[in-house]
Amino acid sequence: MGAYTTAPCDLEMGPEERTVVLIEKKSSTGWMWKVSVALLIAALCFAGVLLFAWYWNGKPEILIHSGQSEALTKKDHAEKTDPHSTLKRISSKAKAAIHLEGSYDEDEGLKDQVEWKNGQGQAFAQGGFRLVDNKIVIPHTGLYFVYSQASFRVSCSDGDEEGAGRHLTPLSHRISRYSESMGSDVSLMSAVRSACQNTAQEDSYSDGRGWYNTIYLGAVFQLNRGDKLETETNQLSELETDEGKTFFGVFAL
């Protein structure tokens, strides 16, 4: 938009001959506004290009991290729901701990109880714990978490006399403590479960070859140095001794 000013005239010529000349003064705001708009458009375009490049370059990395996070989440969930892995992880961090794997062969070794193995599979002992005569020896007086699991697979065929007899024989698993101060064995924990149960249970299922059942024991006890812990289990011929199915352990708190 232009502005106009009046040019000076000769006063001696009189008002009749007075001439007025209008001179247009160009405004400086017009071209500055156009330059600002152009710079703004250029900046927006540049920002759009940068955003587009960042999205496509970062997308594969985001997908990779997302996949890794999902895999780790599934792995953590599996470990949390598996008592064997959870107890193994906790006990391995304790200063004094022992974790044993169970084995049974009626033709070899102990015939009337589970044979506990150290240094086999995930089994270990540290902090003074010892395995003596198939018993765990407590190294120091204090609080300890004692645990054990026994897994069974029992044939429950009604047409089999031996299988029918198992209907009447429950599964049992017990942890006993021997202390010199008491001079005798004392039961710390025990559990009894029906061998053949056609109704749904949390710790039993069938695969067509037999019923699987698990007995788990675990609690905190005040134990003395030199105390000995052992297990007692029936129906040993039905015991499942694959790695992680039958175990026995203690760790200090």
Swiss-Prot record:
Residues 1-34 are cytoplasmic. InterPro entries: TNF, TNF_dom, Tumour_necrosis_fac-like_dom. Its main location: membrane. One of its GO terms (cellular component) is extracellular space. It is found in: Membrane. Disulfide bonds join C156-C196. The keyword Protein biosynthesis does not apply. It is a single-pass type II membrane protein. Residues 96-253 form the THD domain. Pfam families: TNF. Homotrimer. Belongs to the tumor necrosis factor family. Cytokine that binds to TNFRSF1A/TNFR1 and TNFRSF1B/TNFBR. This is Tumor necrosis factor. It comes from Sparus aurata.
